[in-house]
């Protein structure tokens, strides 16, 4: 009987720990000081960047004009340009668990289907009309959610869900998005499947996508060298 009680107590403890694990790993670690300006040149990194001495960093780490202007929307076949403002471009957000992007779109331009593995995304359309699409997980039957979002309107993308934006208007469009991670990461679905290095074996994609090898090779040729 005593052995049973000990085993039961152990099982309860494990269950409680498992319940806490998702909470403990839900976002970036909390900061332990007011500022931790990232030392991007340090050779020592451990799930982030070490801190520069605050006096040596000046006060520019609190401010950035990086998103004031966008990039060339015709610089790639997607017809969009992403201006990133993560810890690499704004060392002041180190340990703060936030980052931002600005995305500009040509008419008909798209931010291709992609995933942010480490962050929830919330965005606001500044100008234009963007079709925002979100695809749920298998738990939802891969349900597709979408809406045309216009200037001043907002949207949210749960962490890890595939999504895209597409400019359905006749003029350029711009949106700004924020993440609850200093480095949200991005996995572009088409590039991941057909432009990986080294390539995913063609027979794997033939079986997974239910197409012939010629189609797979054609798609791979479109993503050689990235976007």
Swiss-Prot record:
Glycosylation sites: 78, 81
Cysteine pairs bridged by disulfides in the record: 36-51
PROSITE patterns cross-referenced by the UniProt entry: GERMIN
Cupin type-1 domain residues: 65-217
CDD domains, alphabetized: cupin_OxOx (cd02241)
Localization in the cell: Secreted, Extracellular space, Apoplast
Matching InterPro entries: Cupin_1, Germin, Germin_Mn-BS, RmlC-like_jellyroll, RmlC_Cupin_sf
Signal peptide: 1-26
Keyword list, A-Z: Apoplast, Disulfide bond, Glycoprotein, Manganese, Metal-binding, Secreted, Signal
Keyword check for Metal-binding: yes
Binding site for Mn(2+): 114, 116, 121, 163
Pfam families named in the record: Cupin_1
The keyword Repeat appears for this protein: no
A GO molecular-function descriptor: manganese ion binding
Top-level taxon of origin: Eukaryota
Transmembrane segments: none
One cellular component term from this protein's GO annotations in UniProt: apoplast
Family: Belongs to the germin family.
Chain's role: May play a role in plant defense. Probably has no oxalate oxidase activity even if the active site is conserved.
Subunit structure: Oligomer (believed to be a pentamer but probably hexamer).
Protein name: Germin-like protein 3-3
């Amino acid at each position: 009987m005593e052995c049973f009680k000990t085993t039961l107590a152990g099982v309860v403890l494990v269950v409680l720990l498992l319940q806490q694990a998702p909470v403990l790993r839900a976002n970036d670690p909390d900061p332990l000081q007011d500022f931790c300006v990232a030392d991007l040149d340090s050779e020592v990194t451990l799930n982030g960047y070490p801190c520069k001495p605050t006096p040596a960093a000046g006060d520019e780490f609190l401010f950035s004009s990086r998103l004031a202007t966008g990039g060339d929307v015709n610089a790639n076949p997607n017809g969009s340009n992403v201006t990133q403002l993560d810890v690499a471009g704004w060392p002041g957000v180190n340990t703060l668990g936030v980052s931002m992007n600005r995305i500009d779109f040509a008419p008909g331009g798209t931010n291709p289907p992609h995933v942010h593995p480490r962050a929830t995304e919330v965005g606001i359309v500044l100008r234009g009309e963007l079709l925002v699409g979100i695809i749920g997980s298998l738990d939802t039957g891969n349900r597709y959610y979408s809406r045309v979002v216009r200037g001043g309107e907002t949207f949210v993308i749960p962490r890890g869900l595939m999504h895209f934006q597409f400019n359905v208007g006749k003029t350029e469009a711009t949106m700004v998005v924020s993440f609850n991670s200093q480095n949200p990461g991005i996995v572009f679905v088409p590039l991941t499947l057909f432009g990986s290095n080294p390539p995913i074996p063609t027979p794997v994609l033939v079986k997974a996508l239910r197409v012939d090898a010629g189609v797979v090779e054609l798609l791979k040729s479109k993503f050689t060298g990235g976007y």
